[in-house]
């Protein structure tokens, strides 16, 4: 093999590695943005229900807790939204 062929193959390998890294980062950011939109939607729904009825929906609060991976471990009501 000539040196130019070796350089071309090495360049293709490096380009493939860079492409994989970039698309992995894009995919991770896409999932993060999608999850954040879902959280924002649930928070908006909780606010609307709180305005309408004067209290929040427990189902929405539980769903939000699952999404943000936090739970209420205290036996009393904590309004930290």
Swiss-Prot record:
The chain crosses the membrane at residues 8-28. It is a single-pass type I membrane protein. Belongs to the HIV-1 VPU protein family. GO terms for cellular component: host cell membrane; membrane. One of its GO terms (molecular function) is CD4 receptor binding. The keyword Ubl conjugation does not apply. Coiled coil: none annotated. It holds the Pfam family Vpu. Keywords: AIDS, Apoptosis, Host membrane, Host-virus interaction, Inhibition of host innate immune response by virus, Inhibition of host tetherin by virus, Ion channel, Ion transport, Membrane, Phosphoprotein, Transmembrane, Transmembrane helix, Transport, Viral immunoevasion. The modification Phosphoserine is found at residues 53, 57. The gene is vpu. Residues 29-81 are cytoplasmic. Residues 1-7 are extracellular. It comes from Human immunodeficiency virus type 1 group M subtype D (isolate Z2/CDC-Z34). HIV-1 lineages are divided in three main groups, M (for Major), O (for Outlier), and N (for New, or Non-M, Non-O). The vast majority of strains found worldwide belong to the group M. Group O seems to be endemic to and largely confined to Cameroon and neighboring countries in West Central Africa, where these viruses represent a small minority of HIV-1 strains. The group N is represented by a limited number of isolates from Cameroonian persons. The group M is further subdivided in 9 clades or subtypes (A to D, F to H, J and K). This is Protein Vpu. Phosphorylated by host CK2. This phosphorylation is necessary for interaction with human BTRC and degradation of CD4. The N-terminus and transmembrane domains are required for self-oligomerization and proper virion budding, whereas the cytoplasmic domain is required for CD4 degradation. The cytoplasmic domain is composed of 2 amphipathic alpha helix that form a U-shape. SUPFAM superfamilies: HIV-1 VPU cytoplasmic domain. It is found in: Host membrane. Enhances virion budding by targeting host CD4 and Tetherin/BST2 to proteasome degradation. Degradation of CD4 prevents any unwanted premature interactions between viral Env and its host receptor CD4 in the endoplasmic reticulum. Degradation of antiretroviral protein Tetherin/BST2 is important for virion budding, as BST2 tethers new viral particles to the host cell membrane. Mechanistically, Vpu bridges either CD4 or BST2 to BTRC, a substrate recognition subunit of the Skp1/Cullin/F-box protein E3 ubiquitin ligase, induces their ubiquitination and subsequent proteasomal degradation.
């Amino acid at each position: 093999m000539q040196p130019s062929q070796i350089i071309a193959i090495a360049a293709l390998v490096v380009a493939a590695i860079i492409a994989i890294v970039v698309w992995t980062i894009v995919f991770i950011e896409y999932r993060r943005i999608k999850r954040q939109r879902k959280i924002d939607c649930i928070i908006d729904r909780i606010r609307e229900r709180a305005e309408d009825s004067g209290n929040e929906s427990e189902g929405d609060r539980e769903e939000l807790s699952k999404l943000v991976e936090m739970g209420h471990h205290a036996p009393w009501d904590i309004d930290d939204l």
